[in-house]
Amino acid sequence: MDIHPHLKLRLLNDWQHDFPLKAQPFASIAVALRVCEEDVLAGYAGALADGSLSRIGGVFSHGAGGAAVLGAMAVPDHRLEEVAAIVSACPGVNHNYAREHRVNLWFVMTGPDRQQVEASMQQLEQRTGLPAWRLHMVRPYRIDLGFDLRHAVSRRPMRVSHPAATEPLQGQDLPLASLIEEGLPLVPRPFAAWSRRLGMTETDVIRTVGDWLRNGRLKRFGVVVRHHELGFDANAMTVYDVPDDRVDAHGQILAAQPGVTLAYRRTRAPGWPFNLYAMVHGTNRDAVRSVIERVTDAAGLVGHDRQVLFSTTRYKQTGGRRFRDHHAQEVSHAVAG
């Protein structure tokens, strides 16, 4: 069935935060929109099919567990498609982009722990015959807090991300974390569907998700959109070289600027002096450049060495799967229960 564009916008925009943690969340959304539950489910199914919806699930904090690293390779132009395909085929890779730079292939490798991530990086190097930078996160200043589709800016007043104070998820929590990364099934009682896979009660699943939101393990739970499919098909990663004793101050101001979707401090690499990163998305390059100039000035970063790396090709974009290796545990939990 065809979904009215206004309804689709509401479904994708309004429940990036505050998604109903109830037995029948889609019915609650239907009441708020004055439509029927079937229209809500059909709307989300259509958005999933056309790629504008990545999933309805959670974004975990940096300290919740698992591991990830930003990787980068300098790939000869004649090998770019070949190497990009090898990188994208790795299950741990959730983002893989070509960018305008000598180091032209940028990807995120995820895994259950740092050792597994490093093993996967070494395997990629062996398969491609190319070295890869490991640019580890030191501190997140802004992670995925959602994106206002009406105004094309990052959502909500900025909440600066400090180092995680919560303990990492462990043991019996990990299968649920894996499902949260995967996303809710589009059925009337999605948490009940999860509960059957986990051997938990529906009430306990909902309560646990709420607890993780309150204690900071989850930064948000709700609709996760894909910018490109919604018309925001220009993006650039801007990197700055900032003295280590001042990077946190600049990073926090940078992260607070409208239009900045992600902001991190990362480790440097030989020949790569940059330690502060910001992502900006927009409908065209001029709009992105304008935001970059504005936020650079606002954060006091004018005069610092910087580079702007526009993306040219998106090879892969999926949700992070730091807990994906724990799917097998779901069966054992359910059987034991």
What are these regions (language model features)?
Residues 1-337:
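A compositional/biophysical signature of low hydrophobicity enriched in polar/charged and small residues
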